[in-house]
Amino acid sequence: MANACTFEGFPSDRKVLKVLTLGHSLTVDSCHFLALIAAAEGDPGLKIATLYYSGCPLSRHVEYLQTDSDRYSLYESNSAEPTPPRITPGMTMKKAVEQEDWDVILMHGGTFEPAYETTYGTGHIQTIQDYVNQHKTNPNAVFGWHMHWVFPTDPELMALYPYTPNGYQVGYEKFGGGRKELYEAIARCMEKYILTDSTFRCLIPTGTAMENALAAGLTEKDIHRDYAHATDYGRVMAGYVWYCVLRGIDHLDDIKLDRIPVKYFRSNKGDQDILLTQEDKKLLLEAVNNALKKPLQVTQSQYTVK
């Protein structure tokens, strides 16, 4: 085991590592800067693709693979030529799986789904894995799981949900707890169902890194841009967690990414590069390293955000 998140048999030592994720917007957020991060770390061999459908739960993945639906979009980037992800609409899961000889296929649930034990007894995970195994072109490809982050409870962020009723307020009401309780429920399910499933060879604890950042004194508005999604700072944090797990890094010595070029922003993100300060890097490094060391536990920070 290279670290607490990368298990025996994970192909982290490949010079070129090809990764396909089956996800939604939180996956897109996590991978948005991943190629840029890998390039900054001197690693030109990471290729990442996300098969995206908005908020996609496991049940919808099953529906779409059974009907060969082309309602997905495929987001692709690679660290040899780090640019914002290229988006191809009208993609099916079959086409995405067969497109490359992927080394790793990553999965995760939709919105609140990973917090419920009933999620892991539906058979959806097995159905998706069977389908991928049927169509993958690399017989040695392995599966991993993305432990995505908990959603903000800040009223101003929650109010940015564009529909009525508010799906995230309803989700929290149905769950019956707050942010802390939701994180703990997800962590319990990871320990009980994912870490004990030998078909998964890695766990990417993005959600734990986010909670570690909050423990350092950051606010939800520092890491979330709305009711669910990450700020650019949150995206960098998520990207570093992904990079370390995918490359089997158990401890990151420093953050080599210095700036995020303006071409990576959406239109409402301004017109200048984002520079990462030493304070930014210090907090990022701690949150990421603590998540790698203790992926299912929030670690209190030695820093205090002013």
PLM feature spans:
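N-terminal module-boundary/linker segments of secreted carbohydrate-active enzymes
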Residues: A2-D43, L284, P295, Q300-V305
